[in-house]
UniProtKB/Swiss-Prot annotation:
Residues 1-22 form the signal peptide. Residues 413-423 have a biased composition (Basic and acidic residues). Coiled coil: none annotated. Belongs to the glycosyl hydrolase 18 family. Chitinase class V subfamily. GO terms for cellular component: extracellular region. Gene3D superfamilies: 3.10.50.10, Glycosidases. This is Endochitinase 1. The gene is chit1. Glycans are attached at N74, N78, N96, N248. Disulfide bonds: none annotated.
Length: 423
């Protein structure tokens, strides 16, 4: 999963394959195989977002969210999973936190997320492990039964200590068949450890297991899709970063289709979704991951044209948060064929490909028509509020998020206040 562009620049090698053309599905909201609890409406929350971005757990639109994917935890090559920022995760004292509590207690984002869970019983929290920057040790961590067991046990230990509802693995990406096989074995080990913990301390509760998955065929063709579909609850298909500063021409960041050949679109969401389903992943387990940011192109004559440079960004060059992307003098252009949107300023020749509420509605209509599991967003701090919120737009179009309840009772947590449910 991104940091996003410092990481995305390294994806150049994955952006070589060209997808075939796709025919759009019909527009009506045809619902196929809807989950009993409703649709997923998940979002990544980054622990580094509490710093410069000043985006705190309490800022999450919790009532509109089914899953918060808390990113990221790190891992060692022996499989041990650990906090990459303990101050943000468990130490930071928020305004209502006491400095005089007795015992061993957890604070930071972990406590704040638990309090959100108590107030919003349909919001589940997932520990997200890895990400683009911290995927280096996955091959070693997944390579033996011992390291896989170490990963599973250490991940589940943190999960129960922190009061979370599941684990999300973000391995970017298995490089060959051996690693793809080991990925499945790692996930199976995690599933077994989750079930063993539930049997002992949370009988009847199902801890969830998901992964972040690539939308580029050069990466997903290496995966054992059918096996992943069996062991996982959800596959969050990262249908974004289809183009960027590494590209040869400006293009959509996250288009649904690629029916206009002149746009030089290297990827499209529909092609990836169909390939995952053909590969054996149940459609209901595919969650469509959407961007809350835009990629920019400088000195270009329009979409599908050459460009020179990525320009500035909100936090990294070439990436604009959705909430601040609007530029004076730029025209907004909705591509009804490929289902993409971009702004273009002819005076400075700047193009920014970004999703909007209308595009989000199109994508929710699409995922419903395909029988997919729901939506996921990267990442929370980039969104707007109110009617312009992409997370909120998705939630409303889905009919509200998945209503299955979270877990509040963690009797085996090492933290006194977690065992007491923050009473």
């Amino acid at each position: 999963m991104p940091s996003l562009f410092a990481q995305s620049l390294a994806i150049i090698a994955t952006l070589q394959a060209t997808l075939g053309l796709a025919t759009p599905v019909s527009a009506p909201d045809t619902v196929i195989g809807k989950h009993a609890g409703g649709y997923v409406n998940a979002v990544y929350f980054t622990n580094w977002g509490i710093y410069g971005r000043n985006y705190q757990p309490a800022d999450l639109p919790a009532s509109q969210i089914s899953h918060v994917l808390y990113s990221f935890l790190n891992l060692s090559n022996n499989g041990t999973v650990y906090s990459g920022d303990s101050w943000a995760d468990i130490d930071k004292h928020y305004p209502n936190d006491s400095w005089n509590d007795v015992g061993t207690n957890v604070y930071g984002c972990v406590k704040q997320l638990y309090l959100l869970k108590k107030a919003n019983r349909n919001m589940k929290t997932m520990l997200s492990i890895g990400g683009w920057t911290w995927s280096t040790n996955f091959p070693a961590a997944a390579s033996t039964a011992a390291t896989r067991s170490n990963f599973a046990k250490s991940a589940v230990t943190i999960m129960k200590d922190w009061g979370f509802d599941g684990i999300d693995v973000d391995w970017e990406y298995p490089a060959d068949d051996v690693q793809a096989t080991n990925m499945v074995l790692l996930l199976q080990a995690i599933r077994e450890e989750l079930d063993a913990y539930a049997a002992k301390f949370a009988q009847g509760y199902h801890f969830q297991l998901s992964i972040a998955a690539p939308a580029g065929p050069a990466n997903y063709n290496k995966l054992h899709l059918g096996d992943l579909g069996k062991v996982l609850d959800y596959i969050n298909l990262m249908a974004y970063d289809f183009s960027g500063s590494w590209s040869n021409s400006s293009a959509h960041n996250a288009n649904l289709y690629a029916i206009r050949a002149n746009l030089n679109a290297p990827f499209n969401t529909d092609h990836a979704v169909n390939d995952y389903i053909k590969g054996g992943v149940p459609a209901s387990k595919i969650v469509l991951a959407l961007p809350i940011y835009g990629n920019s192109f400088q000195k270009t004559n329009g979409i599908g044209k050459p460009f020179s440079g990525a320009g500035d960004g909100s936090w990294e060059n070439g990436i604009w948060d959705y909430k601040v992307h609007s530029k004076a003098g730029a025209d907004g252009i909705y591509d009804d064929g490929d289902k993409g949107y971009y702004s273009y300023d002819p005076s400075v020749k700047e193009l920014i490909s970004i999703d909007t509420p209308d595009i989000t509605k199109d994508k929710v209509t699409y995922l419903k028509s395909k029988g997919l599991g729901g939506s996921m967003f990267w990442e929370a701090s980039s969104d707007r509020s109110g009617s312009q919120s992409l997370i909120g737009t998705s939630s409303n179009k889905l009919g509200g998020p998945d209503s299955t309840e979270n877990l509040l009772n963690y009797p085996d947590s090492k933290y006194d206040n977690m065992r007491k449910q923050m009473a």
